[in-house]
């Protein structure tokens, strides 16, 4: 009887961990889609001289990026063979945070070339992380 209970408990824990991993992947996919949307809005804002679109894009990127300030979240979404890159992902999220704050400051000062440079820093941070985590 005890063996059966232990087997059921073990099976339940396995199912729970698989479901949790699947949930983490879904959350990560949604965050990435929303960050992409924010980046696209920033770029469109620069192309069409639309400050409101730039600002809303920056706000969206900042909001979604907050997810990656938590080490446990990062660990849950990194592939098993990339778990050691947790610090890189955390550093990247801080780079994005700094670049978005810098971008807001430059926009407030009407220094659009510098604001666009900050946008490039955001995209470069994303690319650096994706390069290492995805093994590009």
Question: Language model features by range: what are they?
Answer:
Residues 12-20:
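Hydrophobic h-region of N-terminal signal peptides that target proteins for export
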């Amino acid at each position: 009887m005890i063996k059966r209970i232990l087997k059921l408990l073990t099976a339940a824990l396995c199912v729970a961990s698989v479901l949790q991993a699947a949930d983490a992947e879904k959350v990560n996919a949604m965050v990435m889609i929303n960050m992409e949307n924010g980046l696209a809005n920033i770029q469109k804002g620069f192309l069409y001289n639309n400050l409101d679109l730039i600002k809303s894009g920056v706000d969206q990127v900042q909001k979604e990026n907050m997810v990656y300030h938590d080490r446990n979240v990062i660990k849950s979404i990194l592939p098993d063979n990339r778990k050691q890159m947790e610090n890189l992902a955390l550093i990247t999220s801080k780079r994005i945070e700094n670049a978005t704050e810098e971008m807001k400051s430059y926009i407030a000062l009407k220094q659009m070339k510098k604001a666009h440079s900050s946008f490039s820093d955001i995209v470069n941070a994303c690319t650096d992380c994706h390069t290492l985590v995805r093994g590009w």
